Amino acid sequence: MTTLYLLTDDLRLADNPALAAAARDTALAVACCIDESLFTRDKFGCQGMGPLRWQFQRESLLDLTQSLAELGHTLHILRGSPQEVYADILQNHRFDRVVRARGHEFGRITWWQNLKRRFPGIEFVEVDASTLYGVDDVSSADFSGSFSAFRRQLGEAPLRTLVPTPATLPAPVELESELIVTPEPGDISGGALAGNQHLDSYFATRAASTYKETRNQLEGESFATGFSPYLANGCLSPVQIANRLKTYEQDHGANDSTEWILFELLWREFFRWYGRQHGEKLYAFAGINGQRPLTTFYQDRFNRWRDGNTPWDIVNACMRELKQTGQLSNRGRQIVASCLVNELGLDWRCGASYFTQQLIDYDPCSNWGNWQYIAGVGADPRGGRHFNLDKQAELWDPDQQYRSRWCEGKAASTIDSFDYYGWPQDAAAP
């Protein structure tokens, strides 16, 4: 049998059940389509992928290209609409099977289903490769409720077993492709090699034993695990991290901090299956329950939030870090999201869209699910979250070092550039 293996968010050889399934046949082609629609702008003026995340993804693709070459394979990288690009391949080459990691985001599910309908004579196989649990483990879970309910429903279900890295692959099938991976140096290196090096270096320290105390910081050495960019691109799997965490606990002991790392992997898991169940509702203004929030979209307010030019210097510092680096702490994300929804009264989707563009560790289900959570249209039984911005600044930046690092000049005195009559109001100092 001849198999076409389609890469999505599984850019690695190690612990890749989808690749293992594809490698059982006699001939194999490995392909990845860069969706060109990600580089267009939506109604909020945001791209589906900005230059910082694109650089990290290019680095990840280059790393995988080199790893596959060592096994005698070419990573065929193409650009366009995934549905059209893959349909063209299937029309012009003979394949018996198409394999990919199971999709959880509505767009990926849609083009996959359309291909299945278009090519009924080909077997289409999805494999759980980006989650801790398989589809059978969560099939009875209810994703309209809380995360706590999801955890209870999982019960004692075991994590997916680690899959060995393949030593060989079937004979390669050549396709036409273009190599478009020429990354420039960045602050974070993408790819499975860099991801595994980071995994090793993190657990070589004792940072995991104090993670619960540092996780809410805005910055600092090893205050966060740093796994999220590699998870989002599939350079690391959550099972790899969970297994290394278990080894660390055996060597150094388990505590609240080590348990919290697994707890946050479970949050990611929850949002993956939440996104798969709710489909288009993940992106709906009214969320999963059809309750429209009392917010709207003001371009000027959005611009000021995006550029870090609001009356709150803690928000400004966070937004400027995000704009320049593509990174932002978990606490920082909650602060700026609460500001956009509650203080600025903006449509939560414009914030989620900007995060989509900027974040190196962008994960569709986690990003949009968390924004729904803050906006009160998602899985939060409390109906949204509203943070006191002054209190957040006092708690997490008491010495103002973070704000001093990212903010120059005085914060804006108002949330609008113009008053009711259209006259300019006070702006931030240059």
Located regions from the model:
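An acidic- and aromatic-residue-enriched active-site/binding cleft used to recognize and process polar
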Residues: 8-10, 33, 80, 103-105, ...
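N-terminal beta-strand-loop-alpha-helix module at the start
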Residues: 1-72, 425-430
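Beta-rich, aromatic/charged-enriched effector core domains that present basic-aromatic interfaces
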Residues: 82-193, 372-374, 390, 404
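General small-molecule cofactor/ligand-binding pocket signal
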Residues: 29, 74-78, 123-127
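Residues at alpha-helix caps and immediate loop-helix transition turns in enzyme cores, especially N-
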Residues: 15-18, 111-112, 351
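Active-site-proximal binding-pocket segments
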Residues: 223-412
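Glycine/tryptophan-enriched, flexible segments
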Residues: 141-289, 393-430
